[in-house]
UniProtKB/Swiss-Prot annotation:
Entry EC number(s): 2.1.3.15
Function: Component of the acetyl coenzyme A carboxylase (ACC) complex. First, biotin carboxylase catalyzes the carboxylation of biotin on its carrier protein (BCCP) and then the CO(2) group is transferred by the carboxyltransferase to acetyl-CoA to form malonyl-CoA.
Superkingdom per UniProt: Bacteria
Similarity field: Belongs to the AccA family.
Name under which the protein is recorded: Acetyl-coenzyme A carboxylase carboxyl transferase subunit alpha
NCBIfam families in the cross-refs: accA, AccA_sub, PRK05724.1
Length: 323
């Protein structure tokens, strides 16, 4: 099976293999097979549309972790210009799992901050598989406070399985670093836009996710724990991950229904990894539209709106018939 395809995409993989086989046959002979290839390509598109219309929460969770899915640096190259990366938390060290710096969106200066996973083995290890340590969150906080001083909007990109749970991270104050970010971001005197581009795992995601506008890519996820972790706690078996994913409501569509997410950004057919440029263009347009609206607001009104937005989470409306 082609490694670019997940298990539930096997019928698509088989069809794409046939198309590739026909192309190889046609390239080595005088037989015109363009019409047959076109028919199979059309069939592949129809099949992909059919499969992706009915994805389960677990299948979407798998897509959010796809090894070929674009990461933050892939989007920075396609969405922004003049990116100048800034390093270090000015207290301990620099954490490569968090990337941040000043850049421009359609010519407007902004501060961009986000998680970065690794693509190859060495890079995965260097970036700790996208799991930040306290110094990563303190670096993010330093850049946010810098953005506030220079009146730059803050754009965050969320893609992490969670904050690093190692002993060294706990010794250096992992929970304190996350909590401080939550507090400061809730009162930051500049617009904050957050985009979930892959996994949004627990406090590790939330530490750069307090915002005025939260948007998610169509096949990204946002949850308090991974489906496997939830299944291990509730059922004592990670095999129950599909059931856990369904119960958790971690998909962009479900979170939008619940009012947690403000906007769902449509991905290219088959997922963002099928077309980096198209996915980046969709994010760029969404960011530009929201940025114009938020930057026009008075600072006090912006912070009050953000506070009310946060306080609206978790409200329970009881049915009078049940009382």
């Amino acid at each position: 099976m082609n490694p670019n395809f997940l298990e539930f995409e096997q019928p698509i993989a088989d069809l794409e293999a046939k198309i590739e086989e026909l192309r190889l046959v046609g390239s080595g002979s005088d037989i015109n097979i363009s019409e047959e290839v076109a028919k199979l390509q059309e069939k592949s598109i129809t099949l992909t549309e059919s499969i992706f219309r009915g994805l389960s929460s677990w299948q979407i969770s798998q897509l959010s972790r796809h090894p070929k899915r674009p990461y933050m640096l892939d989007y920075i190259k396609r969405i922004f210009t003049d990116f100048d990366e800034l390093h270090g938390d000015r207290a301990f060290s620099d954490d490569p799992a968090i990337i941040g710096g000043m850049t421009r969106l359609n010519g407007q200066p902004v501060m961009v901050i986000g998680h970065q996973k690794g693509r190859e083995v060495k890079e995965k290890v260097r970036r700790n598989f996208g799991m930040p340590k306290p110094e990563g969150y303190r670096k993010a906080l330093r850049l946010m406070e810098m953005a506030e001083r220079f009146k730059l909007p803050v754009l965050t990109f969320i893609d992490t399985p969670g904050a690093f749970p190692g002993i060294d991270a706990e010794e250096r104050g992992q929970s304190e670093a996350i909590a401080r970010n939550l507090r400061v971001m809730s009162q930051l005197k500049t617009p904050i836009l957050a985009t979930v581009i892959g996994e949004g795992g627990s406090g590790g995601a939330l530490a750069i996710g307090v915002c005025d506008h939260l948007q998610m890519l169509e096949f990204s996820t946002y949850s308090v724990i991974s489906p496997e972790g939830c299944a291990s706690i509730l059922w004592r078996s990670a095999d129950k991950a599909p059931e856990a994913a369904q119960a958790m409501g971690l998909t962009a569509g479900r979170l939008h229904e619940l009012g947690i997410v403000d906007q769902v950004i449509k991905e290219p057919l088959g997922g963002a990894h099928r077309d980096y440029d198209q996915a980046a263009d969709a994010i760029r347009k969404a960011l530009a539209a929201q940025l114009e609206s938020l930057c026009s607001m008075e600072t006090d009104a912006l912070i009050n709106r953000r506070y009310e937005r946060l306080m609206s989470y978790g409200n329970v409306v009881s049915d009078p018939a049940d009382e």
